[in-house]
Amino acid sequence: MDNKHLIKDIATTFGAVIESIKDVDENSFNKIPFENSWTIGQVTEHIVICSGGVQDNKTGDAGRACDENLDQLRAIFLNMEEKSKASPQVTPRQPPHPKNGLIDQLERNKNHLLSIAMERDLEKLSLDMEFPYMGYLTRYEWLSFICLHTQRHLNQIRNIQQQL
């Protein structure tokens, strides 16, 4: 486990999302690029919803390496050929979306995640919520998931930009 690498990943990933959307005009930000696609604003809102923190009010000892599930998470979220539908609780609302407000929220989420990575014991198992098909994840794995999930949607944003 490498906290410095994770901290760098969080900062770099969220910085890349912000960079990719900051110069997009409001019309393009909220334009549906093709049928059954989200807008850049919807993808950004989805990232914001999914990156608000780690469910870790109740924790315990993992009894395993804190990054044991990392390869499986990478295989799931970095495979761009696999598509899945977002669950209702993380589905963004319909456009329009306020670009600057979402950028501000991305920045707040990034800072919150960085504080978790720097200040908390990442080896602890988060017992508040199970990850589908994997069970409980450590804080390290949850933060890694958030990065991988965000990277996946950064790719989606870039693909949408090419269609506009």
Please annotate each region the language model reported.
Residues 1-5, 53-105:
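Short, helix-capping/interhelical loops that line the mouth of catalytic, cofactor-
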Residues 2, 6-9, 13-39:
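Charge-rich, low-complexity N-terminal segments
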Residues 3, 7-10, 40, 102-106, ...:
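Hydrophobic packing residues in well-ordered alpha-helices of helical domains and bundles
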Residues 9, 20, 76-79, 105, ...:
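Residues that form generic nucleotide/phosphate-binding pockets
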Residues 10-13, 47, 109, 149:
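Hydrophobic/aromatic residues within well-ordered alpha-helical segments
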Residues 14-22, 51-55, 110-121, 154, ...:
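Structural signal for well-ordered, non-membrane alpha-helices
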Residues 22-33, 91-97, 111-142:
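Acidic interhelical loop/turn segments
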Residues 31-78, 123-164:
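Short, contiguous alpha-helical
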